[in-house]
Amino acid sequence: MASRPKRRAVSRVPPALGDEEEEDEVEEQDEDDSDEEEDEEDEVVNEEVNIEFEAYSISDNDYDGIKKLLQQLFLKAPVNTAELTNLLIQQNHIGSVIKQTDVSEDSDDEVDEDEIFGFISLLNLTERKGTPCAEQIKELILRLCEKNCEKSMVEQLDRLFNDTARPVGFLLSERFINVPPQIALPMHQQLQKELAEAHRANKPCGKCYFYLLISKTFVEAGKSNSKKKRSNQKKDELMFANAEEEFFYEKAILKFNYSVQEESDTCLGGRWSFDDVPMKPLRTVMLIPGDKMSEIMEKLKEHLSV
């Protein structure tokens, strides 16, 4: 049996505490005796499970988990997620996966030590020019940009994709929705250290002049209709599945949204509502200058430090 991958220098992060428990107690006081059984069932459903997460280097055992998270990002888009997953595993000098912290043998919990709850990595699209999945990603972004943006933005993005002197890195940071955003800070910090080391050692994925990011976002249903609106969505209208990606959005020199309403058929990408307001699932594409990453890291540190 293969040994478990080495731990990354990332802090353990407990899940964020919910505020549902207090609300449930108030509701129970107002319920009739006939509803007690239903309340008990709700209490079980809302029970908080305290799980700690830890980061590990990416290994072959993480293939299924990474591919699943990539499929949630791309949905039905024509991108070979199997090939992309293999590339991320091959270049495991960068990137990390989030797993549950080791559980003692006498624990009653059934834990799959290979189950991943999220990952972070980067694919240098410029270095990988000609690789099928890298070309598919660029073609997808350009096609969606053409559909949702003005011609000038499409031309700008096309020039950047073809500028071999200024590499574009595709930043991937995906996790399940129950993983707290606080884990994003050490994960991104570690990735930046690994990218800097790769650059010094002349390894793949080294220096990136731009970072491309596709973020899972939501907007109130009925908004984001016109082409101009989709390419210039107001930040306060967008809700980010990964809360920290709002800081990347603020520094992006190019950004646009596209709807995935027709492609979404899962819990993480399907029908959403906040305060009884129906939400429309989107993907938000951003291009961030590499020299803005230190400012973004400071923002993450300010808002996500545990």
UniProtKB/Swiss-Prot annotation:
Record PTM Phosphoserine, positions in chain: S34, S104, S273
Organism: Bos taurus (Bovine)
Ranges of biased composition (kind: Basic residues): 1-10
Family per similarity comment: Belongs to the BCP1 family.
Short name of any one Pfam family annotated for the protein: BCCIP
Subcellular location(s) per record: Nucleus; Cytoplasm, Cytoskeleton, Microtubule organizing center, Centrosome, Centriole; Cytoplasm, Cytoskeleton, Spindle pole
Signal peptide: none
GO biological process: DNA repair; microtubule anchoring; microtubule cytoskeleton organization; mitotic spindle assembly; mitotic spindle organization
Biological function: During interphase, required for microtubule organizing and anchoring activities. During mitosis, required for the organization and stabilization of the spindle pole. May promote cell cycle arrest by enhancing the inhibition of CDK2 activity by CDKN1A. May be required for repair of DNA damage by homologous recombination in conjunction with BRCA2. May not be involved in non-homologous end joining (NHEJ).
Keyword DNA repair: yes
Any single Gene Ontology cellular-component annotation: mitotic spindle pole
Top-level taxon: Eukaryota
Assembly, per entry: Interacts with BRCA2, CDKN1A and MTDH/LYRIC. Interacts with DCTN1/p150-glued and ACTR1A/ARP1. Interacts with alpha-, beta- and gamma-tubulins. Interacts with TENT5C; the interaction has no effect on TENT5C poly(A) polymerase function.
Record-given protein name: BRCA2 and CDKN1A-interacting protein
Region called Interaction with BRCA2, residue ranges: 51-159
Location of the region described as Disordered in the Swiss-Prot/TrEMBL record: 1-45
Biased composition (Acidic residues): 18-45
InterPro entries to which the protein is assigned, alphabetical: BCP1_family
